[in-house]
Amino acid sequence: QRSFFLLGYTVLDVAIQSQALSRYAIGYILRGTKYIYEGDKRQTLTRGDVFYLGIGHHYIENFPENGQPFEQVLFYYTPADLQRILMHLNITYGLNISNEHSCENCRNRTHVAMPAWNSIRNFFVNTNNDLRDEDFHRDETAENIKMTELIYLIASHEDCCIKSKLLSNVDAAKENFEQIVYDHIFKDISIEELS
């Protein structure tokens, strides 16, 4: 069973929906408006926005645009998926990842959104075109490559809320012994201390 997947979908009807996510999600609005409700506040996302949804309940409303259906592309992933991809990017390509960004938005919300930068916008537009190909939906390797590319584009970008939320998801997987060893591989520490 695949641990993450791509989902592109359209919506014609409008209603507030409760979504209970068991994985993290990163998405992009291709057309329409998305409202995310949190208590008595409403955040508006429009065409060209990239967004992050954390695990848990989200109250969302998707609006069509000018008679055309609402359209978005979503990637779902687990902390283990993210950890595996980041380790691959670091070991294979030497990608050093850091993040100094922290703001009230990142700390207190289970969702964040921002206008997409050029490379991420192009990525999602191309991914949407790939999703129109039926064979793509059955190609796990293509999905893995797309997910790795998405993580790279976010992790290599300047510090921002999306990057901060994404990288905070690795912490949930840090209990993994392999990750602990990897974290200490260049430190003067014994195997006994690691265990």
Question: Language-model features: where?
Answer:
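Short acidic/polar alpha-helix capping motifs at helix-coil junctions
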Residues: 1-2, 23-27, 126, 141-145, ...
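N-terminal regulatory/effector-sensing and dimerization cores
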Residues: 2-99
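Small-side-chain structural scaffolding
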Residues: 25-27, 168, 195
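Juxtamembrane/interfacial segments around transmembrane helices
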Residues: 74-80, 105, 127-129, 173, ...
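Alpha-helix boundary/capping residues
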Residues: 89-92, 127, 184
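Short, Lys/Arg-enriched, Trp-marked, Pro/Gly-tolerant hinge/linker segments that flank
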Residues: 98-118, 131-193
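Amphipathic alpha-helices that form helix-helix packing interfaces
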Residues: 120-123, 127
